Amino acid sequence: MISVKNDRIIVDRKAVEKFVDKKYAYFSTIGATRTLKLAGGTITVSGGNYGYDMDKKKQVKSLVKALETGKDHNLKVDYEQKGWGVAKGNDIGNTYLEVSIGRQHVWMVRNGKIVLSTPVVTGNVAEGNGTPYGTFSLMYKTSPATLEGENNDGSKYKTKVNYWMPFFAGCGFHDAPWRGSFGGSTYLRNGSHGCVNMPPSQAFALYGIVEAGMPVIVHG
């Protein structure tokens, strides 16, 4: 990785890049398989866009610079994206949103305590619009919002909601005042286009306590 020529330290950048590539999987957790003890029980889930992502270019640059000095350094890992918990071990932390598809339920946990618990309706399984599984980052929140997209028959839809909190592509949490009930098996044939439909009062409550970047764990 390093050599000395004419009293000058020469760093093999390609060797450094290979070293960083090997360490990438250790320090990056996006899409990882996680076994977590959550409000709804112990679950295993993989996929999603949440987690730590090492900035390889920046890491190579800082490592080369450190090696060129010929001195000992305590280098920090350079991250392009960070999670809410520690980088290794539990990168979720103790504040998160949990969605159980099988139980049709959402829990909001803050500092290890359940602060919101509600039945919901998720994506329509029969029409292939099931809510995606994985660990995601809450993108943002806005109120009100107009949700637009296509139905399975190609027709367009435009729905106004009071509270919109997306976590992946067009999927997110929102109020669904048109539904008379939540939970149960409704999602199997009469679910959403992929979103997590919530009772209006619960969507209002959730909107007031969530933050962008918060982990969202969707499992079976």
Language-model-detected regions and their locations in the chain:
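Surface-exposed, secretory/extracytoplasmic low-complexity segments enriched in Ser/Thr/Asn/Gly/Pro
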Residues: 1-159, 163, 210-212, 217-220
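Active-site scaffold segments
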Residues: 162-209, 214-218
